[in-house]
Amino acid sequence: MSRPSTPLLDKAPTPDRLRALPEQDLPQLAEELRTELIDAVSTTGGHLGAGLGVVELTVALHHVFNTPYDRIIWDVGHQAYPHKILTGRRDRIRTLRQAGGLSGFTKRAESEYDPFGAAHSSTSISAGLGMAVASELSGEKRNVIAVIGDGSMSAGMAYEAMNNAGALDARLIVILNDNDMSIAPPTGAMSAYLARLVSGRTYRSVREAAKQVAQKLPKFLQDKARKSEEYARAFFTGGTLFEELGFYYVGPIDGHNLDHLLPVLKNVRDTQKGPVLIHVVTQKGKGYAPAEAAADKYHGVNKFDVITGKQAKPPANAPSYTKIFGTSLIEEARHDDKIVAVTAAMPTGTGLDLFGEAFPKRVFDVGIAEQHAVTFAAGLASEGYKPFCAIYSTFLQRGYDQVVHDVSIQNLPVRFPIDRAGLVGADGPTHAGSFDTGFLAALPGFVVMAASDEAELRHMVRTAAEYDEGPISFRYPRGDGVGVDLPERGSVLEIGKGRIVREGTKVALLSFGTRLQECLAAAEELGATGLSTTVADARFAKPLDHDLIRRLAREHEVLVMVEEGAVGGFGSHVLQFLATDGLLDRGLKVRALTLPDIYQDHGKPDAMYAEAGLDRTGIVRTVFAALHRDELGHEALPTPFRA
């Protein structure tokens, strides 16, 4: 299929070339950019809706500001694909999220036009403020623009940064991309006119003069003047909250109308002193009918047919882990009315949308606010409820102090279902669930579990529901289960007890999580070479099954721990126990297989696990090396001594 015709876009591969175009050409450029974006993402998959919503804004920003000298920071980065196309990366845009290709987010190592990497939300204003202050300290007149969505404004970090920026009176521009109309819709031409007016030099000069006059009035008249001025501006523009934080507010304006965007951005560029917030209203999926009609379904997409919008989804051999969690929690909630669920703006991603349909009054979406989510759940637990605080592994990092201070130290029975554990593939290192086992298992009294398959996940949901002795977590990966038979309802597992799933005599493989299937496959290969292999499912990283580990250590020559997490997790805890229990004193050969001590770039999970040595081939190779055997499993001959 031929690519769309884009004559203007072909002339503007970089922002300096874009700035050379006359303004009357920019609407056509925006349409060509939108067409190119749709075509590219249809071949790669990725985040489509957000990018379609900021096409005109992206064109306007690069036309008005002198990038890369001026800094544009895209919060989260979902909306940065048009930015990538306009900043010299169009020739690689069809490698998005592919191994060796462009990142799906902004990345400093990828381009000088990406001044700050992102993927987690609500960081742009803080980073932008740091850059703005650095510019002032260096005596430079650099513009710093942070583009943040209204969803990201639900996180406290955004307001912490705005409060600091207002206090510093820093030269910072924040563009609030309101694509859900959750703050205020535009009011047509009058709103655009007022936004243009109040961003201009004349209005601001008059306003400053009026303030100076008011300061000479008696205090009670000063207060009345201030309140009257705030009321008038709030009536027209709705910006009182941002004004109170020290920002000059402009908007709301139509983020798809270049005739409105360009003059406002120029006025702010030319007159700005302290921090300014420009409120633009956009539509997610703008310009592509299927995405406009179903914004949630086109936020993140698989490859799709541009004509029909139909996404290519491979048939599932088993239900997803996320769905198993959601349906299992519903089953437990039917038996226990104290069970409630908490999510931080990810009800669909965590499976709690299903729970919400069944129990709408027992699910709480707190927004992009993981810190609050954890402590909110702690409050529920303190009053006798059973909160399941479902957060992706990578996002739980944002609430770690609350996990320690508000949950663990008080030994409150908050349940943590940890989705997206292990590698997640195309989203890369910012979304990998690598660290939760290590940072949770370090906490005294914290129960840490990992499901090896979907049936085990169902058992762990039941176990967590019944466990009231303190905090408990269970991790599971993105994607479909392995196809095992599912019980109608899970069973309660004995805390701190694993299981043997295959008996052997020479080699022991101790798996924590869904690498169990690779361990079983490796055991078959090892058995074919005469190495009888035991395979065990640890289930628990904390408390460890000491009896099981002792048995494996005493009855086998080689013990290999396998986990889909970083160094410092399950394997480290097992090694600590082996050492303190004296089990290393008899010549046991021990190996710990973990994710490598690097941030792995995006790619396909299977290939990434193979690269890490966490597939069957890597496990077999590790056993052979421990026993000094070659790649075929034959005992290696000693190297002849040479003088």
Swiss-Prot record:
Annotated thiamine diphosphate binding sites: 78, 119-121, 151-152, 179, 288, 370
Which top class of enzyme applies to this chain?
transferase
Q: How is the cofactor bound?
A: Binds 1 Mg(2+) ion per subunit. Binds 1 thiamine pyrophosphate per subunit.
Which positions in this protein are listed as binding Mg(2+)?
A: 150, 179
Write down the Gene3D superfamilies for this protein, in alphabetical order: 3.40.50.920, 3.40.50.970
Catalyzed reactions per annotation:
D-glyceraldehyde 3-phosphate + pyruvate + H(+) = 1-deoxy-D-xylulose 5-phosphate + CO2
Kindly list the cysteine pairs connected by disulfide bridges. none
Q: Which UniProt keywords apply?
A: Isoprene biosynthesis, Magnesium, Metal-binding, Thiamine biosynthesis, Thiamine pyrophosphate, Transferase
One Pfam family this sequence matches: DXP_synthase_N
Record's InterPro entries?
Answer: Dxylulose-5-P_synthase, THDP-binding, Transketo_C/PFOR_II, Transketolase-like_Pyr-bd, Transketolase_BS, Transketolase_C, Transketolase_CS
The EC designation for this entry is 2.2.1.7
Required cofactor(s)? Mg(2+); thiamine diphosphate
Q: Name one GO biological process term.
A: glyceraldehyde-3-phosphate metabolic process
State the protein's purpose. Catalyzes the acyloin condensation reaction between C atoms 2 and 3 of pyruvate and glyceraldehyde 3-phosphate to yield 1-deoxy-D-xylulose-5-phosphate (DXP).
Q: How does it assemble?
A: Homodimer.
User: What NCBIfam families does the record point to?
Assistant: dxs (TIGR00204), PRK05444.2-2 (NF003933)
| Protein known as | 1-deoxy-D-xylulose-5-phosphate synthase
Species this protein is from: Brucella suis (strain ATCC 23445 / NCTC 10510)
